[in-house]
Swiss-Prot record:
InterPro entries: ATPase_NBD (IPR043129), Heat_shock_70_CS (IPR018181), HSP70_C_sf (IPR029048), HSP70_peptide-bd_sf (IPR029047), Hsp_70_fam (IPR013126). The gene is HSPA1L. The keyword Nucleotide-binding applies. Molecular chaperone implicated in a wide variety of cellular processes, including protection of the proteome from stress, folding and transport of newly synthesized polypeptides, activation of proteolysis of misfolded proteins and the formation and dissociation of protein complexes. Plays a pivotal role in the protein quality control system, ensuring the correct folding of proteins, the re-folding of misfolded proteins and controlling the targeting of proteins for subsequent degradation. This is achieved through cycles of ATP binding, ATP hydrolysis and ADP release, mediated by co-chaperones. One of its GO terms (biological process) is chaperone cofactor-dependent protein refolding. Keywords: ATP-binding, Nucleotide-binding. This is Heat shock 70 kDa protein 1-like. GO terms for cellular component: blood microparticle; cell body; cytoplasm; cytosol; nucleoplasm; nucleus; plasma membrane; zona pellucida receptor complex. ATP binds at residues 14-17, 73, 204-206, 270-277, 341-344. Expressed in spermatids. Belongs to the heat shock protein 70 family.
Length: 641
């Protein structure tokens, strides 16, 4: 399988679900995974025997909540003591530990405790999407565009890029999710003069509002706003709390401390929420939810809307903020685009429609797929796709937060203003604060507050060796250079000596070191190899089991009466039963053991079966094309535990 040159994929790495697409033959294909689903849960599970990713991981979550990791996007690029991390930890069934100020997820895998960085968990989801694309395209894929919320800061973008590297991807670019949705939308709407588009993206875990202008194939992001912690999961949480209370009232029992019960309830709540987008009532039926009690109940759409009323109403605040930032009246918006599965909720649509005085909402793009669609187009552009559809597309992104440095008195002096189009480069001259000052400390911040103490420190460095001079005389030129991925380089130069020092905002922000990333790449390969070994082991076990059952049915066949001696028949049956009993207690044996046992059985059965067939036969087992020594041909049926 040679890599096809010039093919790149677009990946929407979501908090709860992810999606992958590819642009080929003039159109975007959203690629279904091995379960036939066009979105894949961003879940990774660890068990005593294997690692599961995607649907398989989500499907077993009720049985194994402590070792099933999701929401890695809420941890990625954050510090352990970040209030967001601390608040989320209370809701997660898995354990998050502090290692050198960074969060790691602690799970039990193959009987041992293992800790993973969020980047590693995300890389496993990315690997699954990469394999999904490779299975569809029929060749390896390395180039990808990955999307992030517009609100992600520098360290979250870097960490997402690192996750791509660990998964063996060459990340061409990190782009904002709303920008990707706009590309998808822009392709659907060709040249109609300048249009102002509001993108309302309410997904499983994040909420983004963006205002763009699209003019003649050029996209410009005018403003972004949102809430990094609002989405479908929060609506699920409201339903869960509601039903926990209902269970208390009905059965006088509190299930909130039982992780498995809560997880099963959450799964049912997510299903009910989806049902309520198309029906006015949903039923929940959970057998033996807690202490043997069956929980059968229902909820109406009106009650659901009441439970989430403040959250739904709250979605309009970022809309107003984005309009203010873009200095735009709501009447100036031409199109309102819905992105993210949660925008299917009728109440959310109604609130938005009412806010825009009854305007039609644009729902022509599948809200779950729009972001991956746009990322796939952007990937094609970056790979130099020359087709007319993508040729005229130019992408202008923005910096989500102002970037600047601390000046005398702890004041934030912004060089790159929030919502500036990126890539961009800004230079400013600074000077010393006191006489004969030998050096300056350059401290780089992101944020909108007037004082640096209220903003987020990205990194710092010293510029030393400034010749003695009165205050205000030395000239220090500071340049902020932000690239298309939103990654920042800051350079300071003393004009008199030409001395230079610089920083790329990476490690000081808790980014993984190069060594750590390399180690994780190796780990990822190791886990992949282990998964392969596990698959081979199961195949060997199934081969042994089906051979034993096959032999039992062959020798017990009524049509063979008299063709096989009773002692031979019993010999085979006893051996088969002995092996099947051995299998019962040795489910976790190694592949070699299964193979060895099968060979042992074959060696015993083959002479008897050969003798039987040489003796000529007329029974139903004849003429089936059975070749001694080889398992019977025919479809391979994978067994599901």
């Amino acid at each position: 399988m040679a890599t096809a040159k010039g093919i790149a994929i677009g990946i929407d790495l979501g908090t709860t679900y992810s999606c992958v697409g590819v642009f080929q033959h003039g159109k975007v294909e959203i690629i279904a995974n091995d379960q036939g689903n066009r979105t894949t849960p961003s879940y990774v599970a660890f068990t005593d025997t294997e690692r599961l990713i995607g649907d398989a991981a989500k499907n077993q979550v009720a049985m194994n909540p402590q070792n099933t990791v999701f929401d890695a996007k809420r941890l990625i690029g954050r510090k352990f003591n970040d209030p967001v991390v601390q608040a989320d930890m209370k809701l997660w069934p898995f354990q998050v530990i502090n290692e050198g100020g960074k969060p790691k997820v602690l799970v039990s895998y193959k009987g041992e405790n293992k800790a993973f960085y969020p980047e590693e968990i995300s890389s496993m989801v990315l690997t699954k999407l990469k394999e999904t694309a490779e299975a569809f395209l029929g060749h390896p894929v390395t180039n990808a565009v990955i999307t992030v919320p517009a609100y992600f800061n520098d360290s979250q973008r870097q960490a997402t890029k690192d996750a791509g590297v660990i998964a063996g991807l060459n990340v061409l670019r990190i782009i904002n999710e709303p920008t990707a949705a706009a590309i998808a939308y822009g392709l659907d709407k060709g040249g109609q003069g300048e249009r102002h588009v509001l993108i309302f993206d309410l997904g499983g875990g994040t909420f983004d509002v963006s205002i763009l202008t699209i003019d003649d194939g050029i996209f410009e992001v005018k403003a972004t706003a949102g809430d990094t912690h609002l989405g479908g999961e929060d609506f699920d949480n409201r339903l869960v709390s509601h039903f926990v209370e209902e269970f208390k009232r009905k059965h006088k029992k509190d299930i909130s401390q039982n992780k498995r019960a809560v997880r099963r309830l959450r799964t049912a709540c997510e299903r009910a929420k989806r049902t309520l987008s198309s029906s006015t009532q949903a039923n929940l039926e959970i057998d033996s939810l807690y202490e043997g009690i069956d929980f059968y109940t229902s909820i109406t759409r009106a009650r659901f809307e009441e439970l989430c009323a403040d959250l739904f109403r709250g979605t309009l605040e970022p809309v107003e903020k984005a309009l203010r930032d873009a200095k735009m009246d709501k009447a100036k918006i031409h199109d309102i685009v819905l992105v993210g599965g949660s925008t299917r909720i009728p109440k959310v649509q109604r609130l938005l429609q009412d806010y825009f005085n009854g305007r039609d909402l644009n729902k022509s793009i599948n809200p779950d797929e729009a972001v991956a669609y746009g990322a796939a187009v952007q990937a094609a552009i970056l790979m130099g796709d020359k087709s007319e559809k993508v040729q005229d597309l130019l992408l202008l992104d923005v910096a989500p937060l102002s970037l600047g440095l601390e000046t005398a008195g702890g004041v934030m002096t912004a060089l790159i203003k929030r919502n500036s189009t990126i890539p961009t480069k800004q230079t400013q001259i600074f000077t010393t604060y006191s006489d004969n000052q030998p050096g300056v400390l350059i401290q780089v911040y992101e944020g909108e507050r007037a004082m640096t103490k209220d903003n987020n420190l990205l990194g710092r460095f010293d510029l030393t060796g400034i010749p003695p001079a009165p205050r205000g005389v030395p000239q220090i030129e500071v340049t902020f250079d932000i690239d298309a991925n939103g990654i920042l380089n800051v350079t300071a130069t003393d004009k008199s000596t030409g001395k230079v020092n610089k920083i790329t905002i990476t490690n000081d922000k808790g980014r993984l070191s190069k060594e750590e990333i390399e180690r994780m790449v190796l780990d990822a390969e190791k886990y992949k190899a282990e998964d392969e070994v596990q698959r081979e082991k199961i195949a060997a076990k199934n081969a042994l089991e089906s051979y034993a059952f096959n032999m039992k049915s062959v020798v017990s066949d009524e049509g063979l009466k008299g063709k096989i001696s009773e002692s031979d028949k019993n010999k085979i049956l006893d051996k088969c039963n002995e092996l099947l009993s051995w299998l019962e207690v040795n489910q976790l044996a190694e592949k070699d053991e299964f193979d060895h046992k099968r060979k042992e059985l074959e060696q015993m059965c083959n002479p008897i079966i050969t003798k039987l067939y040489q003796g000529g036969c007329t029974g139903p087992a004849c003429g089936t094309g059975y070749v001694p020594g080889r398992p019977a041909t025919g479809p391979t049926i994978e067994e599901v535990d």
